[in-house]
Amino acid sequence: MSYALLRPFLFNLDPEHAHELTLQLLEKAHKARALGFIYSQQSLPTECMGLQFSNPVGLAAGLDKNGQYIDALAELGFGFIEVGTVTPRPQQGNEKPRLFRIKEADAIINRMGFNNLGVDRLIQNVQRAKYKGNIGINIGKNAVTPVENAADDYIYCLDRVYPHASYITVNISSPNTKNLRDLQSGEALTELLDSIKNRHSQLATEYGFYVPMVLKVAPDLTPEQVDYIANQLIEFDIDGLIATNTTLSRTGVEDLPFGDEAGGLSGRPVGHLSTQIIEQFYERLEGKVPIIGVGGIDSGDKAVRKLNAGATMIQLYSGMIYQGPKLVQQCVEAITSHRDAMML
């Protein structure tokens, strides 16, 4: 069954229930070996952070928080999969309802709150996966951990995921964990990166191999914050930047049903804001740190815009909820055409 036929049924369900049902259906299709007949693997070799990717279109964190559906999702044609956000201990997240569709704007508001089964369960799932491509693991802090002790949670997760990840994302930009975004600014960011990077370097020595570490930031940054973060990325030799997470802005949805719900806004309305932040970071980083662009990508053209803004690769999430899995192929094809045109 095509996603276009399935979508009206799913959109009549509670969003969180629809999310779980979709993943379960995808898993069943994978086990029945049906996905390979529907979706083709897209090849557009890309190098980023010293890693080789089959194509530059990845799955953003949040869709598969516990790494339960890696093999099924990989069959949709992604060049890489990012799982999480995962925390040291399991947590239920915020109270329901906590996920809202804004259909008129192809947008989503969520206040999930890092609901997950804990880092140890995620590692078990990653180990079981047969997928041979790159798997990023997105790590965060538990809600009960004071923000001044956040480094302890990140290091706890870092220690456990290091030998199992292709790259590790330090998520300090979710708006749904109290005070988490404070870690994006000033001394708090410097101290956090200093602690995490020291442990990261120790792990590289202990294991004898290097796993890239990236930082995921919000779109709601001032130019001064962008400058500071860019300097810190270079100072601490961070391997990549994911820009961006969801926004607290309600521009474009303020008068729509559910537009006033608390949480982070994703989907089409965040696209321009995300692209602006990518442009600002690209200018300040001067090519020293690669950028993975995410936010508001719902077409091949939008994917190319992220690359034109300075991104090396992109990630999808909300756009795929509205457009379906074919969006992966559309983005790879658009980027391929863009690259070919650049070489003429």
From Swiss-Prot:
A GO MF term: dihydroorotate dehydrogenase (quinone) activity
Among NCBIfam families, the record links this protein to: PRK05286.1-1 (NF003644), PRK05286.1-2 (NF003645), PRK05286.1-4 (NF003646), PRK05286.2-5 (NF003652), pyrD_sub2 (TIGR01036)
Q: Where does FMN bind?
A: A61, G62, L63, D64, K65, T85, N138, N171, K216, T244, G267, G296, Y317, S318
Query: This protein is called what?
Result: Dihydroorotate dehydrogenase (quinone)
Kindly give the InterPro entries that the UniProt entry links to this protein.
Aldolase_TIM, DHO_dehydrogenase, Dihydroorotate_DH_1_2, Dihydroorotate_DH_2, Dihydroorotate_DH_cat, Dihydroorotate_DH_CS
Write down the chemical reaction(s) this protein catalyses: (S)-dihydroorotate + a quinone = orotate + a quinol
Primary localisation category:
membrane
